[in-house]
Design a protein with these regions (language model features):
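A residue-level marker of the well-folded mature domains of exported/periplasmic proteins
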Residues: 19-211
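Bacterial N-terminal signal peptides
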Residues: 7-15
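Positively charged n-region of N-terminal signal peptides that target proteins for export
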Residues: 1-4
Length: 211
């Protein structure tokens, strides 16, 4: 996804054919929901790729897993009149209105990794999370031989990958009455949170076969 992200953005803006105009500047705002390691790498690759094109400026702001911060960040980019906005939404419901606001003002919006709750954006770059959930469900069925109890640790409640992966998992397990989701907890996409909740659940549920 990261490899082709900026190319998609530049194509949307028409920059690839107009960068020869020395005095033309394009300002891209990036609103990241989090600052984990793979997002740092994504940010680095976006900035690095932008260096190959004259007149492209990239500014990145990180919400640190806080939807209020992200709403402020996106409004900041709107006020700065960015030429294009890239958003990795923290929570779909909370961030949807401000993304729609940017789109309604004529700012091209590329939504990455996580979706919003409407189609008022220019493009989406991300995975098929329902299919990922189904694949995990099928792996569980094969691994447990169709019988057992599992603990599901989701991503941040309210983020579309977490919702869609849970939906895909549940769909895959519908035809498997021998497999029970004994507990489902919100790991918030954070290893420390997920680890703490997993330890707590496993202490009280010794019969869980798979996490």
């Amino acid at each position: 996804m990261k490899k082709h992200l900026l190319f998609l953005i530049l194509c949307l803006m028409g920059i690839l054919t107009s960068c020869s105009q020395k005095h033309t500047r394009y300002y891209i705002g990036v609103s990241q929901c989090s600052d984990d390691e793979w997002r740092h790498k994504m940010n680095h690759e976006i900035v690095r790729e932008a260096l190959f094109y004259d007149g492209v400026e990239v500014e990145i702001r990180t919400a640190k897993d806080n939807s209020r911060n992200q709403i402020e960040d996106i409004n900041y980019f709107i006020d700065r009149k960015v030429d294009l906005l890239i958003v990795a939404p923290n929570e779909a419901a909370a961030v949807t209105p401000v993304v729609e606001k940017a789109y309604g003002l004529g700012i091209p919006v590329v939504v990455i990794d996580r979706k919003i709750l409407s189609d008022r954006y220019t493009a989406f770059v991300g995975a098929d999370n329902c299919e990922i959930g189904k694949d995990v469900g099928q792996y569980i069925v094969n691994r447990l031989g169709g019988k057992g109890k599992i603990l599901e640790i989701t991503g941040l409640e309210g983020s579309t990958p977490a919702m869609e992966r849970h939906r895909g998992l549940a769909d895959a397990l519908k035809a498997e009455p021998g497999i029970e989701i004994a507990a489902s907890v919100d790991g918030a996409w954070l290893q420390s949170v997920a680890g703490e909740k997993m330890d707590s659940i496993l202490q009280d549920n010794k019969d869980i076969n798979l996490v």
